[in-house]
Amino acid sequence: MRQIMIAVAIAVAVSILLTPALIRLFTKQGFGHQIREDGPPSHHSKRGTPSMGGVAILAGIWAGYFGTHLAGLAFDGEGITASGLLVLGLATSLGGVGFLDDMIKLRRSRNLGLNKTAKTVGQITSAVLFAVLVLQFRNPAGLAPASAELSYVREIATVTLTPALFVLFCVLVVSAWSNAVNFTDGLDGLAAGCMAMVTGAYVLITFWQDHNACVTAPGLGCYNVRDPLDLALIAAATAGACIGFLWWNAAPAKIFMGDTGSLALGGIIAGLSVTSRTEILAVVLGALFVAEITSVVLQILTFRTTGRRVFRMAPFHHHFELVGWAETTVIIRFWLLTAITCGLGVALFYGEWLAAIGA
């Protein structure tokens, strides 16, 4: 628990202190966000707000994770693990794709960055590298950072994926989560606040897995997760970085995270879900993100097949703005929904453990 608290503290400090420096730098360089002309009228006043604040979020995550391990040398903490590095590497790789996208938008002063093909290739490449590596690096107990079996709270033994199918599965998971968070990042503080809650839930889940790991505490209900404590540090550092960034990103936002932040944060959820064996449970924890990307898919499919739109605008947080909800009302209500789904997800996780031990 001490390591988790250190990770949060370092990440909050780095993010909250670095963000205003980025605001000054990007404002001086003229790196202002471009607004869609067909978006809600209230958003036009945000034109010129600095973007690429995801740099501060990623810096906070890196500092929180590695800073905690450096501090751990003083009290014999566990070292850096393959699981932690793979999740961090996935997030950083996707953040790099987002950074290129943001830079093109800012340099060309338009709301369109990388074309769809280039962006998709970047996401797929990141996912494939992650998928190939995450089944390697087995520890002395024979556990790899991930399992080829589909997982809810633990592996579902009846659903085992071949190596090729596992790679395709990871491409789907990584692409879905990175795009889902990207679509959600359309209102001040919405994505950062929701991410803080989802990763906070993952801190609880992975911390519990660490205390009930089959390697150290074999018995009913134990978990075959390779490095649960290190995953808890990644989750804690992410939550802390999002909280620090939210100080400046809350309405009215002084800076946006941009694709640099949203794609990276989607990678965090994807990586944590795969390495903690909770791919299906993650859908409950991040249900708001799932709803956002689903609204986009429904809007596109419905319009192409019927010529009509389900929502006034997608992602559907803009729909609620266009029907008269204030932006802050949408944000707070979506935060509340995320808190509820995170609570439900943690309850399902704990309930499964109780059932496993026969309680």
Swiss-Prot record:
Class of the enzyme per the UniProt entry, highest EC level: transferase
Source organism, top-level taxon: Bacteria
The entry's keywords: Cell cycle, Cell division, Cell membrane, Cell shape, Cell wall biogenesis/degradation, Magnesium, Membrane, Metal-binding, Peptidoglycan synthesis, Transferase, Transmembrane, Transmembrane helix
Cofactor(s) needed for function: Mg(2+)
Bilayer-crossing regions: 3-23, 55-75, 80-100, 117-137, 156-176, 187-207, 231-251, 255-275, 280-300, 334-354
Reactions mediated catalytically: UDP-N-acetyl-alpha-D-muramoyl-L-alanyl-gamma-D-glutamyl-meso-2,6-diaminopimeloyl-D-alanyl-D-alanine + di-trans,octa-cis-undecaprenyl phosphate = di-trans,octa-cis-undecaprenyl diphospho-N-acetyl-alpha-D-muramoyl-L-alanyl-D-glutamyl-meso-2,6-diaminopimeloyl-D-alanyl-D-alanine + UMP
Entry keyword Signal: no
Pathway as given in its UniProt record: Cell wall biogenesis; peptidoglycan biosynthesis
Main location (coarse class): membrane
Subcellular location: Cell membrane
Classification via InterPro entries: Glycosyl_transferase_4, PNAcMuramoyl-5peptid_Trfase, PNAcMuramoyl-5peptid_Trfase_CS
HAMAP family: MraY
Function: Catalyzes the initial step of the lipid cycle reactions in the biosynthesis of the cell wall peptidoglycan: transfers peptidoglycan precursor phospho-MurNAc-pentapeptide from UDP-MurNAc-pentapeptide onto the lipid carrier undecaprenyl phosphate, yielding undecaprenyl-pyrophosphoryl-MurNAc-pentapeptide, known as lipid I.
Protein name stated in the entry: Phospho-N-acetylmuramoyl-pentapeptide-transferase
Gene source species: Mycobacterium ulcerans (strain Agy99)
